[in-house]
A protein has these predicted regions:
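Beta-strand signatures of extracellular beta-sandwich domains
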Residues: 195, 206-210, 325-327
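Noncatalytic modules at the cell exterior or secretory-pathway interfaces
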Residues: 191-192, 234-254, 358-374
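Solvent-exposed, flexible loop/coil segments flanking beta-strands in beta-rich domains
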Residues: 141-202, 255-320, 376-397
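Bacterial N-terminal signal peptides
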Residues: 17-30
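Extended, compositionally biased non-globular segments
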Residues: 314-386
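N-terminal secretory signal peptides that target proteins for export/translocation
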Residues: 1-12
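Aromatic- and Gly/Pro-enriched helix-to-coil junctions and flexible linker segments
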Residues: 31-189, 197-200, 209, 240-251, ...
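Beta-sandwich interaction modules
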Residues: 219-239, 345-362
Length: 397
């Protein structure tokens, strides 16, 4: 019950920090849908047909759609459960700050791949969910929406499938598979973005694409776009480069007894060589092992030995954190914020491309400060855990 006691305070905080993400992969809900009270008072001025469906379609429809990655569709009012069956869970997720899974704090540096649900639209959904979930004008015929199994950024310049199918058998809910994929390039290629086409959309939970012995090309989550780095930056793949693909699988409850076979495909988007001739490199700063003390703020640091332009950051977390801040500290003592996160959970790792890259000199100290969150709070329950690390995407000087 302590989680519910904090919902009101979190709701106020969400609205004051201005925006909340709309890329809703995941209302991964701990509770199941319950029956709807037909006699519940309809106090909301907003209805599903007029106000709520367009918001859910445009902001959550990549995942919460029939055949999509999420275990339920929110794009019907009551068909097969529909949004009305999940209204209470939607409310809980929004008030807890647990969903949508986007954690960039707008008081920090702006990030490129941001999809926001503005406070007004957030308020509409919460008001509808708590105000009797009215259906609205029944003469409005809503369009049928199905999952689009295609490339969000258009057909890639090169598609590289997994070398062999991977099977997750019955009664196996989670698994991981790591493979190498040769590019067979006869010359160097410059890559501006990388995407993934999941073989089984309902099961491919996340993926990491990197160059063997080189930079991280993509941190992929369902519903994400393939976003270009800022200021024309790009990755360089040498002739004969080999890619490493790691895919994490997580079945929904509907598929627990099924044997599912995945053959995901990497998509590469090429570009011209940047004017600088410099390629994005990956630098990692490892945190302490063992997990945080729930009552004590955590901090660690590393050094950017070679100067460069920071174009992106990739936090990997070992626990939920109420706040995460990455700061560059120059030899003079001057501090520059690189990234701020709020209510961040480890099961949603992301790459945050900066809107405005930040130039740092050699031997800049990188400080990371974290305020622990409650690993068991809220509708999501206990979080997954990964090794604590902050990845930096750097274009060398």
């Amino acid at each position: 019950m302590k989680a519910f006691a904090r919902f009101g305070a979190r709701h106020a905080r969400v609205l004051t920090w201005g925006s909340i993400t709309a890329v809703t992969l995941g209302l991964v809900l701990a509770s199941t849908a319950t029956g709807v009270d037909a006699h519940k008072a309809k106090t909301s001025p907003f209805s599903y047909n007029v106000d709520i469906f367009p918001l859910l379609r445009d902001n959550c429809g990549r995942c919460h759609v029939d055949g999509g990655p999420a275990p339920m569709s929110l794009l019907t009012y009551d068909q097969d459960g529909g949004a009305i069956a999940w209204a209470e869970s939607i409310r809980e997720m929004l008030l807890a700050g647990a969903m949508p899974p986007w954690y960039a704090d707008p008081t920090g540096p702006a990030v490129r791949n941001n999809h926001n649900l503005n406070p007004r639209d957030l308020d509409k959904i919460i008001t509808w969910a708590t105000g009797g979930t009215p259906h609205g004008d029944l003469t409005i015929k809503l369009p049928a929406v199905t999952y689009r199994h295609d490339w969000a950024a258009g057909k890639p310049d090169l598609e590289l499938p997994m070398p062999r199918p991977y099977t997750v058998g019955p009664n196996v809910m989670q698994a991981s598979n790591e493979v190498t994929i040769p590019t067979n390039f006869t010359e160097a290629k410059w890559v501006k973005s990388v995407d993934l086409m999941p073989g089984v959309a309902s099961m491919v939970r996340r993926a990491y694409v990197s160059v063997e012995g080189g930079p991280v090309l993509a941190v992929w989550e369902p519903g994400d776009d393939a976003v270009d780095p800022p200021s024309g930056a790009a990755f360089k793949l040498a002739a004969g480069a080999t890619l490493r693909l790691k895919v994490d699988y997580k079945k929904s409850w509907q598929d627990e007894q099924k044997s599912l076979v995945d053959t995901s495909v990497i998509g590469l988007y090429f570009t011209e060589e940047p004017l600088s001739g410099k390629a994005i490199a990956s630098v990692s700063i490892d945190g302490p092992k063992g997990g945080p003390d729930a009552a004590v703020p955590l901090s660690f640091s590393g050094t950017l030995k070679n100067g460069g332009r920071i174009v992106g950051l990739r936090p990997m977390l070992d626990s939920p954190y109420a706040s995460v801040e990455v700061t560059a500290v120059a030899a003079s003592g001057r501090k520059v914020s690189l990234l701020k996160l709020r209510n961040a959970r480890p099961e949603w790792p992301r790459r945050y491309w900066l809107v405005d890259p930040i130039e740092l000199p050699a031997n800049t100290k990188i400080e990371v400060t974290l305020e622990p969150g409650d690993p068991d709070i809220g509708p999501l329950g206990k979080a997954e855990s990964f090794a604590l690390q902050i990845g930096l995407d750097v274009v060398p000087q």
